[in-house]
Swiss-Prot record:
The keyword Ribosomal protein does not apply. Pathway: Fermentation; pyruvate fermentation to lactate; (S)-lactate from pyruvate: step 1/1. It is found in: Cytoplasm. Substrate binds at residues 79, 85, 117-120, 145-148, 227. GO terms for cellular component: cytoplasm. It comes from Thermus caldophilus. Changing residue 150 to Q: Increases the thermal stability of the enzyme. This is L-lactate dehydrogenase. Changing residue 46 to E: Increases the thermal stability of the enzyme. In the absence of fructose 1,6-bisphosphate (FBP), the Q4(R) mutant exhibits a 4-fold increased Vmax value and a 5-fold increase of the affinity for pyruvate. CDD domains: LDH_2. One of its GO terms (molecular function) is L-lactate dehydrogenase activity. Beta-D-fructose 1,6-bisphosphate binds at residues 150, 162-167. Catalyzes the conversion of lactate to pyruvate. NAD(+) binds at residues 10-11, 32, 62, 76-77, 115-117, 140. The gene is ldh.
Length: 310
């Protein structure tokens, strides 16, 4: 099965590398305005496949996306140190106005998987530009934030992160909502499990974990300029869910008719992901404080998209 990636920068190339190592696709096509960059990444990643899986990785044009089941949209400008994801909006919306029509001309049946930041607003932009059913335009959303939340909880509790079920909702960014109230470990409510484990979560512990999740991207960008390994692996996992019709639940961003009274906004909620993209949304139980925080997050994203006319 073929997967396309538009944008061969750090996120696009990391995604291609993760796809190859995990053996998610049989063919990966990298498309970029800088053909030499795309070719260099494709050749380098191809040389890793003898140590992993038989995946054909190559550079191509938009026409080479024909037949792709999923296309990752990673084109855009990089986030600068200290710059919020929403400040990227104007620059990256202009890029998508050129990219989305060309992708759909070549691969009209593909699920569009948006990775460009600010990802929630860019998901809304891609949805409006594409005129596709809303489920076929999926943003990477808070999958990485959710993974960070689970990893930090697991570290505190000294359990495997795979046993932790906790979500980050709303914006992939400053207004994101860590859902503590419905978090579980091995099917046991989080606070109850923590007490039984002898690893109670004090207010200071919760503040430290919240800070660790919320500020992770800023710390990484300050240290090395960009984040790409984590999101590359996350995107590869979403592609696998689409190609295998997995119907797993992921906190991805998609157009949502209404959330907490805010209409027509793209943001992250737990969603069922399969061959057609988003096939359903699971609205979790939230505390009153979490509901209010989610409403505020939705309003921030709604205002940003509205300012662009989307």
């Amino acid at each position: 099965m073929k997967v396309g990636i538009v944008g061969s920068g750090m996120v696009g190339s990391a995604t291609a590398y993760a796809l190859a190592l995990l053996g998610v696709a049989r063919e990966v096509v990298l498309v970029d305005l800088d053909r030499k960059l795309a070719q260099a990444h494709a050749e380098d990643i191809l040389h890793a496949t003898p140590f992993a899986h038989p995946v054909w990785v190559r550079a191509g044009s938009y026409g080479d996306l024909e037949g792709a089941r999923a296309v990752v949209l990673a084109a855009g400008v990089a986030q600068r140190p200290g710059e919020t994801r929403l400040q990227l909006l104007d620059r990256n919306a202009q890029v998508f106005a050129q990219v989305v029509p060309r992708v759909l001309e070549a691969a009209p049946e593909a699920v569009l998987l948006v990775a460009t930041n600010p990802v929630d607003v860019m998901t809304q932009v891609a949805y409006r530009l594409s005129a596709l059913p809303p489920g076929r335009v999926v943003g990477s959303g808070t999958i990485l934030d959710t993974a960070r939340f689970r990893a930090l909880l697991a570290e505190h509790l000294r359990v495997a992160p795979q046993s932790v079920h906790a979500y980050v909702l709303g914006e992939h960014g400053d207004s994101e909502v860590l859902v503590w109230s419905s978090a579980q470990v091995g099917g046991v409510p989080l606070l109850e499990f923590a007490e039984a484990r002898g690893r109670a979560l004090s207010p200071e512990d919760r503040a430290r974990i919240d800070e660790g999740v919320r500020r992770a991207a800023y710390r990484i960008i300050e240290g090395k300029g960009a984040t790409y390994y984590g999101i590359g692996a996350g995107l590869a996992r979403l592609v696998r869910a689409i190609l295998t019709d997995e119907k797993g639940v992921y906190t991805v961003s998609a157009f949502t008719p209404e959330v907490e009274g805010v209409l027509e906004v793209s943001l992250s909620l737990p969603r069922i992901l399969g061959a057609g993209g988003v096939e359903g949304t699971v609205y979790p139980s939230l505390s009153p404080e979490e509901r209010e925080a989610l409403r505020r997050s939705a309003e921030i994203l709604k205002e940003a998209a509205f300012a662009l006319g989307f």
